[in-house]
Swiss-Prot record:
The active site is at E204 (proton donor), K332 (proton acceptor). GO terms for molecular function: magnesium ion binding; phosphopyruvate hydratase activity. It is found in: Cytoplasm; Secreted; Cell surface. (2R)-2-phosphoglycerate binds at Q162, K332, R361, S362, K383. It comes from Campylobacter jejuni subsp. jejuni serotype O:23/36 (strain 81-176). The keyword Ribosomal protein does not apply. This is Enolase.
């Protein structure tokens, strides 16, 4: 049996220049695993707590408290644990914290240790991470949801919807699907420049121009898909992140106030006009009646993804399944705090025929853990930004590596 012999953490920077936690775990045979924890901008209120220092350093965004929790409290408790028993490790972290949302230790402390331990164990066995976590059945390359126009909390522009994405379904390999996205992205840059729009990038590598409304970005994407020659092979996905503009029972966008019913009708109209296959967070995280109506209206036609609605939480997802809210769940490990809890949520979703989308955060790093994790859990879909910025392309490049060993691309079978 290999045991955890050493644990350490320290501050590094994420893609927004904010501190985050890097954890390193060393096993008794000398194997080492490391992981960098991401950070979100648009966050659900029920997410696990990301512990920040709230002092004068980095405008209060330092993570020395979380680092100290790893180096002192967590290390003392987990040294000597079986490195191959991920469930035992993660349950120990949860019990050590003693809260439902990691408000004592910080989910950025616990997740870093959880991820790093999995990496160390995989290294000790000479296995790729996806194979270690997923076993023999880990084989499916996910369809990417590529966010190539950014709005909302991810960009400094006047677009309300947060992400305008393209999904390359009509391909037999991941590399060919990714090629189509690259070509569409390049055409989009030219289209924006030629029309006098900014080609500045948002947090996730997509372009962030000021546009007339929330429909113009979709029209732009359709133009670029057609010019690239990929009509009927690439579809549109939206992350509305509507909690961000929900106030006093209304959705405030484009200078108007919409009721839940109004917004649902807007989505129905958009889906009738455009090849939209997925809408994420179409309604606010606490607008449960609205979610039920939205699911009744569109749930048998398109994918309705709950992000802020479910926050990768098994118990919250279970309630949503019972109430028939949404039909898919976004999977963000740092929303819940450990690898094991993330896997439990995915399994619950899959048992109940809810689709899963593995996801990055807007504050990312070069760590490509979620690429392996998506394949390990056969989520079939992944959100990891545009084809720009190294912290985004790191995940795509890792998936291209995995494809050399496992070449089943879900594509149209999704």
């Amino acid at each position: 049996m290999l045991v955890i012999e050493d644990v350490r953490a320290y501050e590094v920077l994420d893609s927004r220049g904010n501190p985050t936690v890097k954890a390193e775990v060393t096993l008794s045979d000398g194997s080492v695993g490391a992981a960098i924890v991401p950070s979100g901008a648009s966050t659900g209120s029920k997410e696990a707590l990301e512990l920040r220092d709230n002092d004068e350093r980095f405008g209060g965004k330092g993570v020395l408290k979380a680092v100290a929790n790893v180096n002192e409290t967590i290390a003392d408790e987990i040294l000597g644990l079986d490195a191959f028993n991920q469930t035992q490790l993660d349950d120990t972290l949860r019990e050590l914290d003693g809260t439902n949302n990691y408000s004592n230790l910080g989910a950025n402390a616990t997740l870093g240790v959880s991820m790093a331990t999995a990496r160390a164990a995989a290294a000790a066995l000479g296995m790729p991470l996806y194979r270690y976590l997923g076993g023999a059945n880990a084989s499916i390359l996910p369809v990417p949801m590529c966010n190539i126009i950014n709005g909302g909390a991810h960009a400094n522009n006047n677009v309300d919807f947060q992400e305008f994405m393209i999904m390359p379904f009509g391909f037999t390999s991941f590399k060919e699907a990714l090629r189509s996205v690259c070509e569409i992205y390049a055409i989009l840059k030219k289209e924006l420049a030629n029309s006098g729009h900014s080609t500045a990038l948002g947090d996730e590598g997509g372009f962030a121009p000021n546009l007339a409304n929330n429909t113009e970005p979709i029209d732009l994407l359709m133009t670029c898909i057609k010019k690239a020659g990929y009509e009927n092979r690439v579809k549109i996905a939206l992350d509305v992140a509507s909690t961000e503009f929900f106030k006093d029972g209304k959705y405030h966008m484009e200078g108007k106030a919409f009721s839940s019913e109004d917004l649902i009708e807007r989505y129905v109209e958009l889906c009738a006009k455009y090849p939209i296959c997925s809408i994420e967070d179409g309604l606010a995280e606490n607008d449960f009646e609205g979610w039920i109506k939205l699911t009744e209206k569109l749930g048998n036609k398109i994918q309705l993804v709950g992000d802020d609605l479910f926050v990768t939480n098994e118990d919250i997802l279970r309630e949503g399944i019972i109430k028939k809210m949404a039909n898919a769940v976004l999977i963000k490990p740092n929303q819940i705090g450990t690898i094991t809890q993330t896997m439990r949520t995915v399994r619950l979703a899959q048992r109940n025929n809810y689709k899963c989308v593995m996801s990055h955060r807007s504050g990312e790093s070069e760590d490509a853990f979620i690429a392996d994790f998506a394949v390990a859990l056969n989520t079939g879909q992944i959100k990891t930004g545009a084809l720009a910025r190294g912290e985004r392309t790191a995940k795509y490049n890792r998936l291209l590596e995995i494809e050399l060993e496992s070449d089943e691309y879900l594509g149209e079978k999704l």
